């Protein structure tokens, strides 16, 4: 049920996130093709918000043709039960009935001249296959790209909002700061978003938090269940858990344009509760370096017989 909410959520925000769980076959299928877009005037937050509203209206009216036209062909949606493509979302929403949706804390961040990301909190009312949508707010993110002069949804992800857990007690067995020499030079990043993300996790596994910080843009944003973090908050957050045994899999990359790409993947952290999360990062080219601008984590849902709740679009 939680999934429906997400679905709804996404529709409004980016109407964009869908890839039926298809394994790793097309893991980098979109990363190697050049992206071109017609010149377009700089899009405003009002423009993108209006696009979100149009998407939600299309869902309420069950106008699936309009809804589909507002999504890019390589649209990807990340939910707590998997990653969905455009075809998967179009099939999913046909069982969705939306009666009301409310948004709060909308904020647009520019990725580059041809891509933006809209973040917000969303709560929806309605049904999915006759069952009421779950109550509660979701932290959502929806990315839009300029394709041939049109702004289309390309990515959506939402995470059920929850109160932050109490901080873990300090461990005497582990150093409180980076165990890597400050003289060591961080590995270089490039246009390969998957490779970049692996470099970041290598820094985390070695507790080199200075290196981790060097991979983030000054205005980096992170969305987790307990809220939205800035760069300082992200650096502080990663120092509170042991990433040394993290296992990464199910990689998928989507190229927004020549200066920005999305990578999404599954993280398993033995000993954590929950021990699996779906992570996504948007990498951008800034002043000759590839840096992480945006990151979101969504805990994987417990397996249930018939789960229908977050926004699976």
Name what the model sees in each region.
Residues 1-4:
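Positively charged n-region of N-terminal signal peptides that target proteins for export
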Residues 15-16:
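C-terminal motif of bacterial Sec signal peptides marking the signal peptidase cleavage site
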Residues 19-73, 154, 162-218, 304-312:
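Short, low-complexity N-terminal intrinsically disordered segments enriched in polar/charged residues
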Residues 55, 66-67, 75, 89, ...:
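Hydrophobic pocket/interface hotspot
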Residues 68-104, 213-249:
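Short solvent-exposed beta->alpha transition segments
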Residues 71, 81-82, 107, 112, ...:
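A mature extracytoplasmic/lumenal domain signature
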Residues 91-134, 235-276:
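Surface-exposed, charged secondary-structure patches
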Residues 137-168, 276-303:
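Short beta-strand edge/turn micro-motifs at domain boundaries
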């Amino acid at each position: 049920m939680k999934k429906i909410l997400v679905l709804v959520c996404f529709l409004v925000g980016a109407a964009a996130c869908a890839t039926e769980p298809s394994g790793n076959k097309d893991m980098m299928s979109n990363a190697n093709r050049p992206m071109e877009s017609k010149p377009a005037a700089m899009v405003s937050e009002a423009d993108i918000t209006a696009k979100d509203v149009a998407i939600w209206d299309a869902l309420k009216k069950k106008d699936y043709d309009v809804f589909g036209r507002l999504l890019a062909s390589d649209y990807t949606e990340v939910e707590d039960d998997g990653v969905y493509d455009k075809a998967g979302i179009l099939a999913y929403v046909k069982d969705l009935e939306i009666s009301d949706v409310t948004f709060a804390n909308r904020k647009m961040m520019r990725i580059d001249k041809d891509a933006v990301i809209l973040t917000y909190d969303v709560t929806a009312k309605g049904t999915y296959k006759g069952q009421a949508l779950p109550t509660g707010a979701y932290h959502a993110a929806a990315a839009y790209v300029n394709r041939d002069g049109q702004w289309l949804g390309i990515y959506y992800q939402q995470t059920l909002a929850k109160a932050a857990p109490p901080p873990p007690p300090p461990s005497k067995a582990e150093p409180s700061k980076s165990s890597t020499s400050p003289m060591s030079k961080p590995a270089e990043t490039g246009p390969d978003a998957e490779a970049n993300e692996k470099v970041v996790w290598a820094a985390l596994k070695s507790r080199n938090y200075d290196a981790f910080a060097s991979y983030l843009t000054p205005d980096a944003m992170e969305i987790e269940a307990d809220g939205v973090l800035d760069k300082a908050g992200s650096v502080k957050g990663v120092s509170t858990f042991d990433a040394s045994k993290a296992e990464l899999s199910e990689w998928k990359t989507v190229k927004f344009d020549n200066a920005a790409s999305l990578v999404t993947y599954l993280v398993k952290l033995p000993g954590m509760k929950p021990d699996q999360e779906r992570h996504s990062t948007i990498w951008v080219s800034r002043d000759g370096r590839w840096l992480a601008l945006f990151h979101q984590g969504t805990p994987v849902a417990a397996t249930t017989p018939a789960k229908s709740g977050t926004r699976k679009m």
